[in-house]
Amino acid sequence: MADGQLPFPCSYPSRLRRDPFRDSPLSSRLLDDGFGMDPFPDDLTAPWPEWALPRLSSAWPGTLRSGMVPRGPPATARFGVPAEGRSPPPFPGEPWKVCVNVHSFKPEELMVKTKDGYVEVSGKHEEKQQEGGIVSKNFTKKIQLPAEVDPATVFASLSPEGLLIIEAPQVPPYSPFGESSFNNELPQDNQEVTCS
């Protein structure tokens, strides 16, 4: 075994350089499967900017990258439940309203305040255990106020079921100086009267 000899013959037939796509019997069918997607939805003979710009713009409703359809709004937005930390947009004329489940807290353990365009609801609850330990529950929830709501008008009430209802009326839309929905001028009669 001296001089680097091995007790068994060892040959490496795959040591030669080979192309795995050309040598394999499956290589001709490797790229045939479209995986359930259209190969290319548009004509690729167009110059680059003409076919790429629609795919790169956010407003383009077509397919993206080999037939992938752009995602719609999340399921929470489709079913009227706002995303976490966001308040639902108010409808014109209706007050803004959010409910927070605080059934395990007493009213004196809750605090509601507005700060920097957010409503912050926090609660702290402590229980003494018989074994000498203390169990405490703390939570803080921040909800962004819509632009149509004045933070000074926010008020909260606690329902018997343990729901904290936070409401605020919408600020009426303001019109620029000089523009209004009513006309200050008196109506003019089309009849001409000559005084003699």
From Swiss-Prot:
It is found in: Cytoplasm; Nucleus. Residues 78-185 form the sHSP domain. GO terms for cellular component: cytoplasm; cytosol; nucleoplasm; nucleus; protein folding chaperone complex. CDD domains: ACD_HspB8_like. The modification Asymmetric dimethylarginine is found at R71, R78. GO terms for molecular function: protein homodimerization activity. The modification Phosphoserine is found at S24, S57, S87. InterPro entries: A-crystallin/Hsp20_dom, Alpha-crystallin/sHSP_animal, HSP20-like_chaperone, HSPB8, HspB8_ACD. Keywords: Chaperone, Cytoplasm, Methylation, Nucleus, Phosphoprotein, Stress response. The modification Phosphothreonine is found at T63. Gene3D superfamilies: 2.60.40.790. Highly expressed in skeletal muscle, heart, uterus, liver, lung and ovary. Low levels found in stomach and brain. Not detected in small intestine, large intestine, kidney, spleen and testis. In the ovary, expression is concentrated in the endometrium and in the connective tissue between the circular and longitudinal muscles of the myometrium. Residues 1-28, 176-196 are annotated as: Disordered. GO terms for biological process: cellular response to unfolded protein; positive regulation of aggrephagy. Residues 178-196 have a biased composition (Polar residues). PROSITE patterns: SHSP (PS01031). Induction: By progesterone. Its main location: cytoplasm. Belongs to the small heat shock protein (HSP20) family. Monomer. Forms a ternary complex with BAG3 and HSPA1A. Component of the chaperone-assisted selective autophagy (CASA) complex consisting of BAG3, HSPA8/HSC70, HSPB8 and STUB1/CHIP. Interacts with HSPB1. Interacts with DNAJB6. Interacts with BAG3. Involved in the chaperone-assisted selective autophagy (CASA), a crucial process for protein quality control, particularly in mechanical strained cells and tissues such as muscle. Displays temperature-dependent chaperone activity. This is Heat shock protein beta-8. It comes from Mus musculus (Mouse). The gene is Hspb8.
